[in-house]
Curated annotation (Swiss-Prot):
Residues 154-175 have a biased composition (Basic and acidic residues). Keywords: Chaperone. This is J domain-containing protein spf31. PROSITE patterns: DNAJ_2. It comes from Schizosaccharomyces pombe (strain 972 / ATCC 24843) (Fission yeast). One of its GO terms (biological process) is mRNA cis splicing, via spliceosome. Residues 192-209 have a biased composition (Basic residues). GO terms for molecular function: Hsp70 protein binding. SMART domains: DnaJ (SM00271). Residues 31-96 form the J domain.
Amino acid sequence: MADVAKFLDRVEGSLNRGREIDRILSSFKLNAYDVLDILPGMSVDDIRNLYRKKSLMIHPDKNRDNPKAADAFDILKKAESDLVNDKIRESLDSAYTAARNQLLKEKKLSPNSEDVHSDQFLFDLKVRWREILIADEVARRRARQLDLANQQREQARQDEIARERKRRVESEKVWEETRDNRVGNWQDFLHKTKKNNLKKKNKKPRVLG
């Protein structure tokens, strides 16, 4: 009987681990709170403790028969890293507060209203929170693309300046290298011109008649 109980415990544990793995994989990856299935308000130490429990639960070594365990573990690890990062956590908290305030205003509820603690309000809050985070991510990506485009244009401008400088240096180099030839040609031209002028000057005019 004891063996049966142990077997059932193992089956239940395996099912729970599988459900947690699937939950993590289907969570909203831009929101580390959603990955850990918590809301803002927990201390960093509590977040770390929760992460340790969940990571042990879904660790690939304990779920060798589940090929999705490794991906879920990586996602969970990143979420924990995000939430112990003050800047990222504060950004998520700010989006959460904005979503909550928007809903309170739209639904004309006070922060102490019983409806604020209802499942429906929590569902709506998570949806609005998600929308805000998506909008923020889109804005960040556009800003990065714009910054990249500006960098590429500046790089192209600098490259053109460098090419023009190189052309000018090469042109000046050729000019210097051909100086002697130009001087020689000019002297030859002057000498030839002078010689022709002397010929014309010494040439007797033809007598008509």
